[in-house]
A protein has these predicted regions:
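Helix-to-loop junction immediately C-terminal to a conserved catalytic motif
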Residues: 49
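Conserved ABC transporter NBD signature motif
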Residues: 54-72
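Q-loop/switch helix immediately C-terminal to the Walker
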Residues: 80, 85-100
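Conserved ABC ATPase "signature" region
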Residues: 104-120
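Conserved ABC ATPase signature
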Residues: 123-130
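Hydrophobic anchor residue at the start of the ABC signature
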Residues: 137, 176
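Catalytic Walker B motif of ABC-type/P-loop ATPase nucleotide-binding domains
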Residues: 148-152
Length: 201
């Protein structure tokens, strides 16, 4: 599997955010998107996920035309954790597993992967910021998809949780998955190639 971008351009509010961006990511590879605030890192991930319109250029999976196929193969982990406060930890993950599907229906392994098993019956309203982030990361495990689009994935995570995330990412790549991540610092993807965006919005 290969994700290819050719001459991508992003325009927000009538202004160029970036233009002429090209890259390719194959199975087992990771791409780090870096750049200052406003350079378009989050916008690029949203474009790949199909959540933001591409001003010009193309995105293709395995050489096909851009369509819903990329979004169907991708997990997008953005800044918002998108949790329902009244639902328990397990219920929140079950909701997302059913929404994103198909999944096995058993969210216990995903909760264990982010060490939230002990909090499975706790309403999400009582979670700390780091625990909420870990619950969002659990979606990556609960519903396997080939492409992980991670926007500042280590935000609010303590050192132990960052180590667990790095291990999950390494396993994903080893199994043939791919990762495109946006971050200001290291997130545990030592062998990732880098694309630096330099044009402020």
């Amino acid at each position: 599997m290969q994700l290819t971008a050719e001459n991508l351009a992003c325009v927000r509010g009538g202004r160029d955010v970036f233009r002429g961006l090209s890259f390719a990511v194959k199975s087992g590879e990771a791409l780090m998107v870096t750049g200052r605030n406003g350079a378009g890192k989050s916008s690029l991930l949203r474009m790949i996920a199909g959540l933001l319109r591409i001003a010009s250029g193309t995105l293709a999976l395995d050489g096909g035309e851009q369509d819903a196929a990329i979004g169907e193969q991708a997990h997008y982990l953005g800044h918002l954790d998108a949790l329902k406060p009244a639902l328990t930890v397990a219920e929140n993950l079950q909701f997302w597993a059913e929404f994103l599907g198909p999944s096995s229906g058993d969210v216990a392994p995903a909760l264990a992967a982010v060490e939230l098993t002990a909090l499975a019956d706790l309403p999400a309203a009582y979670l700390s910021a780091g625990q909420r982030r870990r619950l969002s990361i659990a979606r990556l495990v609960a519903v396997p998809r080939a492409i992980w689009l991670l926007d500042e994935p280590t935000a609010a995570l303590d050192a132990a949780s960052q180590t667990r995330l790095a291990d999950l990412m390494r396993r994903h790549l080893a199994s043939g998955g791919m990762i495109v991540a946006a971050a200001h610092g290291a997130i545990g993807l030592e062998r990732a190639r880098e694309v630096k965006l330099g044009t402020a919005a």
